[in-house]
Amino acid sequence: VATDHSNRLTGIPAAPFLAADIGGTHGRVALMRASHDGAGAVQTLAYRVFVCAEFPMLSELLQAFIDADVKIPVKHCVLACAGQIMGNEVVNDNLPWPIHLPQLRHALGLDEIAVLNDFEALAYALDDASADGGRHLCGPATPTGGPTLLIGPGTGLGAAVHIPAAGGGFVLGTEAGQMDFAPNSLRERQILAHLAPDGGYVPFEHVVSGPGLLAVYVALCAIHGDAPKLAAPEAVTKAAMKGDDAQAVEAVEIFCASLGSFAGNLAMTFMATGGVFLAGGFLSSIFELLERSAFEERFLHGRSARALLSQIPVRVTEHGLRGVHGAARWYLRHGMPGVGAPMPIAAGGAGA
């Protein structure tokens, strides 16, 4: 998780710096600097979105941004990344490549790199999310205040909690996507049996994510004795939107219902009275299906805390610039540790 450090570098706010949000599918990179509007406020000087799989390593992705958009020397970078830090490496099965921090720093000629979890970065941008509100899904229109929960299914399943406090509050990173998937229906039990025929561990991430949606679709085809016609999560969502593939429609329904269970459990765990934000373009693309689904029923269903959960607003918000904004806000607040002592980050992450 992100922690405060006293060795903040002098002069950081005056110098532009790189902020990158690296997920399993997309790499969002910006050139940022502190604005003069207030502490922690940031200004975006340039911004691009890259497809991670098009680059053999992260350094080449970042260099492509520098070559295209950076006209001045930049020596500092904050990296919001889905993954787990092991020594000087960031490792995640959802990333197309391992990230070795000293090699990355050397390849780009940087002085220092700081790292935090991608969903921690998104949570640090929640002030911006509250400003535009996102798209209301269920619950009251406005929150009562309190902890805010951020959840995002993408290449993986990320979650983080923003705790309000003096000075802007702080963020708790989680590995909630790795919690055991708990079926709530006979069909979900059948899917679980297909995903783990010999029993054993199936994390929520293997159901509530892009790859998870595809896995559910394939499982449903097997249950019905049909050969899968679709080979990508995007194809499943498109077919479900059109309503011309029964297994795709059911897969999205199960995905949405399971997301509701996951969100409700976390909202109870963290008493997220400040609201729940569901992040990512993936959810925005199926918003109408999500709105008609069993999400709300499962968010509330069968819980002694139903009265509490019914007072929590749930909104869908775009990922977009939020990750780089949140990473930059964190950076300006905490400063940069050296790459020899990188920030620990939680496993998982949406990897959008």
Task: Give the predicted meaning of each segment.
Residues 27, 84-86, 156-160, 215, ...:
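Short, acidic Gly/Pro/Ser/Thr-rich loop/turn segments
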Residues 1-73, 190-352:
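ATP-binding/phosphotransfer module of carbohydrate and carboxylate kinases, centering on a glycine-rich
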